[in-house]
Amino acid sequence: LAKRLQRMGVDAYRQGFKLNLLPDRLDEPRRRKKPTIYFVNSMSDLFHERIPDAFIDQVMKTIRETPQHRYQILTKREARLGAYFATRSVPDNVWLGVSVENRRHGVPRIDLLRTIPAQIRFLSCEPLLEDLGPLNLDGIHWVIVGGESGAEARPMHPDWARAIRRQCEAQGATFFFKQWGGWGADGQRRSKKANGRELDGQQWNGMPVTVVDTTAGVSA
């Protein structure tokens, strides 16, 4: 997607995947009065090692000054996430999440996330690359599951998603099934739109209860 936006001449993506801080974007939520869910850094990671703490501080300042919005922040860099909030409080309107794509790298991130006192803590199991096995969802409020998209997408077995759904139901976490991605439930390759987002004949659209007064999401 970044390459496509670069070819289209979109200013923010002229450098492709090269890290590019855009402090001017931080004013947009202040101008928007209607309650909105923002997915922060949807194509990057706010806790990337090259993003200075000072910039993250600016992001958190904007978040605190716009309590009408909700902000989803997802990271694979759980160590830096923990270190950052070890000396700072988490804004009440922030949802903190970690990527949990597999057992080796993803599942261990859950333990650190659980220690951070965010109002909403969530897992993004997308792309789900294998059966995650037993999960401890204590302190986890929301779990997103989805398959991989793109030319090199790997298939997701339906049983992997079902296992997570069952554990969410048993442990009181809200379950959201986002998409099949490039491979359908039947194991056939097709467009993600054609594959849809039904699991066992229905959509699973669980969301944390705090979203009842917000609009559809916006990436930032």
Language model features: what each stretch is:
Residues 32, 65-66, 115-116, 170-171:
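Alpha-helix C-cap/termination motif
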Residues 39, 72, 95-97, 122, ...:
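A structural signal for isolated positions on well-ordered beta-strands in alpha/beta enzyme cores
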Residues 40, 73, 113, 126, ...:
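Conserved, mostly hydrophobic/aromatic
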